[in-house]
Amino acid sequence: MAILIYALACAFGLGSWLAINGLWVELPIIVTTLPEGWELPSYLTVIIQLANLGPLLVTLMHKLCPGRLKESVVIYTILCIGVLACFLLAFFLGRDNCGGWGPAQRSLLHHYFLPGTSGLHLLSHLPALHDAAACPLHHHTEGGDTYVLQTQYLPPNFTTEVFFFFLAVMMCISLAAFWKLNRLPRTFEVSTENLVPDSVSSVCSGLDNPAVRTNSQKHLCEVTSQARPLLTKSGHSMFQLTFIYLMVVWVNGTTNGLLPSVQTYSCMPYGNLAYHLSAALASVANPVACIVAMFFPKRSLVFLGLLCVMGTGFASYNMAMAAMSPCPLLQKSALGEAIIVLSWVFFTGSLSYVKVMVGVILRDESHSALVWCGAAAQIGSLIGSVIMFPLINMYNLFQSGDTCSTKCPL
């Protein structure tokens, strides 16, 4: 039963960011055809942040109308919208832009936090099956001796229509997994809910009938009294929690807002192959980091802080190359392409590990700490995307260029 639940939790979790991650990995092909061009990622980051209105509305419903909102119905609705969005993208990508949604992970059981997180990004690397588009130069003659230089991209092995149909099927699998999870017997809730000690303590207090207390109840009271300090004791000081939350804001702001907005400017000058590999391999680094966190958890705040600094260093290099677009360092060289690809992979992998481990730490702290972790993550993502949007689309601090015909000084 445990293996089945783990598998279903992973299958359900992959639907959370599958459509969005798939859209990001497909950007090397999409940006060459849509009118937004290199600015498209900055639009997507802002559009994705609008999805935060959903959790906000759910929170307001819980506060204003407690007990009336069924989260399972909400998640069913969101998953169905995700399936529909993928189908619409397959048919209307050239005419309409839309962002995907992902189901809230609150319904995942406390005990299956890590497998759900791993499944959340499990299949985000599948778009790497696309072959990178080449960049041949096409010459044709007009009026005798006049040559016109045009950039043409070779089509990938799979069209965007096939790709988004595949994403729709994956979303259907996530929907089926959630349906199955809702119908499994929940015999494991007693061991995962924090409400159990409170209910046991009411039995121990003997409020209903103080004169009647069996030996088993007395033994249960003794066990509960010994376990209670372990459940209520906080393992981190206020300074440490502040550091953790600031790290959550920074890591999510960087990975979900600042850097994704400029990935095209950072990678495209090195060619479509470098952009394709950066997007695909960075998506692979995400689930790999989650799996590493499952088997090699490291809760040391010093280690996580150093890892965060290292990831920030890679992020700084990526941002610097984007600022130098369309003529970054080591352009048109194999070394430059390799460095930018590895920089994006290590940036994503290191900070993904930090995000997972910080979530595990705050999960063990308390349920409210984990809720505030989610709030801090969304705040950081929102700040990052809001900062980058005007810099790219209004102030034009990042310049696009033609990957084949742009001439840069030596």
UniProtKB/Swiss-Prot annotation:
Glycosylation positions in this chain: 157
Domain of life per record: Eukaryota
InterPro entries assigned: Riboflavin_transptr
Residues that span the membrane, as ranges: 3-23, 40-60, 73-93, 158-178, 239-259, 277-297, 301-321, 334-354, 369-389
GO MF entries: riboflavin transmembrane transporter activity
Cellular component, GO, one term: plasma membrane
UniProt KW keywords: Cell membrane, Glycoprotein, Membrane, Transmembrane, Transmembrane helix, Transport
Membrane topology: Multi-pass membrane protein
Main location: membrane
Keyword RNA-binding: no
Reactions catalysed, as given in the entry: riboflavin(in) = riboflavin(out)
Compartment annotation: Cell membrane
Assigned protein family: Belongs to the riboflavin transporter family.
Function statement: Plasma membrane transporter mediating the uptake by cells of the water soluble vitamin B2/riboflavin that plays a key role in biochemical oxidation-reduction reactions of the carbohydrate, lipid, and amino acid metabolism.
Name of the featured protein: Solute carrier family 52, riboflavin transporter, member 3
Phylogenetic lineage: Eukaryota, Metazoa, Chordata, Craniata, Vertebrata
